[in-house]
Amino acid sequence: MARVSLIKEGERPELSDLIGTIRAERGGRFPNLYRALLNSPSVAEGWLKFFTAVRQKAKLHGRYRELAILRVALLNGADYEYRAHVPFALQEGVTQAQIDALPGWQVSAKFDDRERAVLAYTDCVTREIRAPDPIFAELRRHFDDRELVELTATVAGYNLVSRFLEAMQIDHEK
């Protein structure tokens, strides 16, 4: 059960425009994550803008974004984040076999060199904050500066998401 109130639609009329924007940016959905964030409208608004940029306005292919997000969720034990992003990962071309192999990606043949570079970087940034030069050099072989910034923002951002969800004990929608 969430540690803060989950704002219901219509409960606070002054939030109706922001809720409409959330629904528009999130495919008509009003997730529990945003219902919790709306306890601080300015945080909810900034969060929405940042994650819309990361997910919908980035050059980085969604396949790599979603692999990184799922890996962050696994490393942080963030069930909500993981469950929410499996469908997006599948839509972006990640296979179910790859999703199943993510816990032990290092020994799996399901990932190509680019995907392995993304996962190694995600592991380092999530666990240690800094990635060693050889890990970053391998990543740089596959991605340009814009994509590197977007991937790093994705990994850092979804570490924020998982920590927020777990600290606030937000449950996934039923």
Tell where the protein language model's regions lie, with residue ranges.
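Hydrophobic alpha-helical segments
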Residues: 1-174
